[in-house]
Amino acid sequence: MATLSVKPSRRFQLPDWHTNSYLLSTNAQLQRDASHQIRQEARVLRNETNNQTIWDEHDNRTRLVERIDTVNRWKEMLDKCLTDLDAEIDALTQMKESAEQNLQAKNLPLDVAIECLTLRESRRDIDVVKDPVEDELHKEVEVIEATKKALQQKVSQAFEQLCLLQEVQQQLNSDHRGKMETLEIDRGCLSLNLRSPNISLKVDPTRVPDGSTTLQQWDDFSRFNKDRAEAEMKAATELREATALTIAETNNELEAQRVATEFAFRKRLREMEKVYSELKWQEKNTLEEIAELQEDIRHLEEDLRTKLLSLKLSHTRLEARTYRPNVELCRDQAQYGLTDEVHQLEATIAALKQKLAQAQDALDALCKHLARLQADIACKANSMLLDTKCMDTRRKLTVPAERFVPEVDTFTRTTNSTLSPLKSCQLELA
């Protein structure tokens, strides 16, 4: 027998069903009315915003064009200013080089005099004296510097002005590069449109970047750079005109000073050669005396060794005779003779040691004095070498630099040749 299956769920009343249908129909009408209102407002908003967007884009495009024109005008002014600045730098550089060429004839004697003074600073010990040569060299430096002072001042001013011009040039180049980059960026912005492939949304594009300036600051900066460049170019032109001068010839004065200096060099070299020869003679005699004294010391040492062997023999004999038995241990003539021999040998050894000590003291004194002689000889050789180098260097004052070849042996002042071993040793000492 079949049974009725009833779904266990809530059962609504019929009025509830009618009410739900009415609410759905009413809400649908209300939603359509609201949607119609929104659609009308959206159409109005679209028209207004489209018009505003088109106008804003056109207005900003016009502003970009005007800004590009303004930046381009400043760029052209900077171009002209940079061209004039380059020309002025070249002109001032040429004038500076011309002034330096006028000093060239004085630079060589000055360099030679300073080189001689520097070389003579390598003198050692007692040879570091303030002699007439040093006085003449200092006087030579003073004479040369006096003739260079006025023109050197202009050269220094030209150098400083060139530094200022280059600083201005660097500033103008920086400003010019900035305007070139700005033109490239603004022209790129002007070329963009709605169909450009590289447009996208950015994060906070309306921010004000650090270091932003006002339009007035921008204009003042460019105008300041231009005005400063023009002022520096005017100063450079005046300096070029002031630098156009001549230096009075001082060849006679410089030649007279050169002759006086070289005369002092020759006189000083003759003095040192005389002293050097005397010291070498003393060294030779001292070396001979040292050799003889060393030979005598060797003989004394040999005698000491011989006497010591004799003393050992006597000691051994005496010691051996102390072992004689009983009454045989008597003080006989042999005992007295051996005892006297020991005493005599001890006295002899003491005398030889004393004389050996005196000889060694004398040898030490001779060696120390020889060292002092050789040190002074080395000083003299060094001083002669330095002054001869100075004389050789000063040949550049009378021989053109391109033809100058040192032809003097810096020790003997003869033509270059292979030095003997003795002279090579002397040079090493120097």
From Swiss-Prot:
Belongs to the tektin family. It holds the Pfam family Tektin. Its main location: cytoplasm. Microtubule inner protein component of sperm flagellar doublet microtubules. May interact with CCDC172. Residues 80-162, 225-382 form a coiled coil. InterPro entries: Tektin-like (IPR048256), Tektins (IPR000435). Tyrosine phosphorylated. Ubiquitinated, leading to its degradation. Deubiquitinated by USP16, promoting its stability. Microtubule inner protein (MIP) part of the dynein-decorated doublet microtubules (DMTs) in cilia and flagellar axoneme. Plays a key role in the assembly or attachment of the inner dynein arm to microtubules in sperm flagella and tracheal cilia. Forms filamentous polymers in the walls of ciliary and flagellar microtubules. One of its GO terms (biological process) is inner dynein arm assembly. GO terms for cellular component: axonemal A tubule inner sheath; axonemal microtubule; microtubule cytoskeleton; microtubule organizing center; nucleus; sperm flagellum. Transmembrane segments: none annotated. It is found in: Cytoplasm, Cytoskeleton, Cilium axoneme; Cytoplasm, Cytoskeleton, Flagellum axoneme; Cytoplasm, Cytoskeleton, Microtubule organizing center. Expressed at high levels in testis, trachea and fetal lung, and at lower levels in ovary, pituitary, adult lung, fetal brain and fetal kidney. Keywords: Cell projection, Cilium, Cilium biogenesis/degradation, Coiled coil, Cytoplasm, Cytoskeleton, Flagellum, Microtubule, Phosphoprotein, Ubl conjugation. This is Tektin-2. The gene is TEKT2.
